C-alpha cells in the first residue's frame, strides 16, 4: 500500500483491463477447424445437453465454443467461424460458433431471430 506522498510523487499505476475473449486477439471473428464435437451438461440449476466443439483457431489458441440453435451438421474437421460471447451456464465456454458461415449451416425452418442463426428468409 503506497503512502500519500508516494502517490503524489509517482502517481498510481493504471489498472489493465483483461479481455473476456483473449483468444480473439481484438478480431471480431476467427476461423478454426473442429477437433471434437460433443455435448456437455450445464451447471446447477439447469439441465440439458449443450452442444459444444473444441476448435483450434488460426492464431494458435484452442477454444471451446458453443453451437447455438436446434440441430447442427458439424463434425470433426469442419471449418467454422468463431466469435466471442460466453455461455453463462457452461464453465469454460467463452466463444460461439457463427451459424450459416463456412461449414456450419443455418438453423432449418427458423422464422424469428433468423440473422442470429444464419437462416434464409422463408418463401411465402
UniProtKB/Swiss-Prot annotation:
Report the domain of life of the source organism.
Answer: Bacteria
Which residues fall in a compositionally biased region of kind Basic residues?
A: 113-124
What keywords are annotated for this sequence in UniProt? Methylation, Ribonucleoprotein, Ribosomal protein, RNA-binding, rRNA-binding, tRNA-binding
Q: Note the InterPro entries from the entry.
A: NA-bd_OB-fold (IPR012340), Ribosomal_uS12 (IPR006032), Ribosomal_uS12_bac (IPR005679)
Gene3D superfamilies the record matches: Nucleic acid-binding proteins
Q: Does the keyword RNA-binding apply?
A: yes
* GO MF entries: rRNA binding; structural constituent of ribosome; tRNA binding
Record bears the keyword RNA-binding: yes
Residues bearing 3-methylthioaspartic acid are: 89
Name the Pfam families for this protein: Ribosom_S12_S23
An annotated GO BP: translation
Positions of region (Disordered): 104-124
* HAMAP family per UniProt: Ribosomal_uS12_B
Q: How does it assemble?
A: Part of the 30S ribosomal subunit. Contacts proteins S8 and S17. May interact with IF1 in the 30S initiation complex.
Q: Know the name of this protein?
A: Small ribosomal subunit protein uS12
- Species, as recorded: Thiomonas delicata (Thiomonas cuprina)
Amino acid at each position: 500500500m503506497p503512502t500519500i506522498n508516494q502517490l503524489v510523487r509517482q502517481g498510481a499505476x493504471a489498472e489493465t483491463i483483461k479481455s473476456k475473449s483473449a483468444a480473439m486477439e481484438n478480431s471480431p471473428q476467427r476461423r478454426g477447424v473442429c477437433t471434437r464435437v460433443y455435448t456437455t451438461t450445464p451447471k446447477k440449476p439447469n439441465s440439458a445437453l449443450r452442444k459444444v466443439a473444441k476448435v483450434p483457431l488460426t492464431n494458435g489458441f484452442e477454444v471451446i465454443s458453443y453451437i447455438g440453435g436446434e440441430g447442427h451438421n458439424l463434425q470433426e474437421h469442419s471449418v467454422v467461424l468463431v466469435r466471442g460471447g460466453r455461455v453463462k451456464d457452461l464453465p469454460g465456454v467463452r466463444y460461439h460458433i457463427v451459424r450459416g458461415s463456412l461449414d456450419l449451416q443455418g438453423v432449418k425452418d427458423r422464422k424469428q431471430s433468423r440473422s442470429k442463426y444464419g437462416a434464409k428468409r422463408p418463401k411465402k
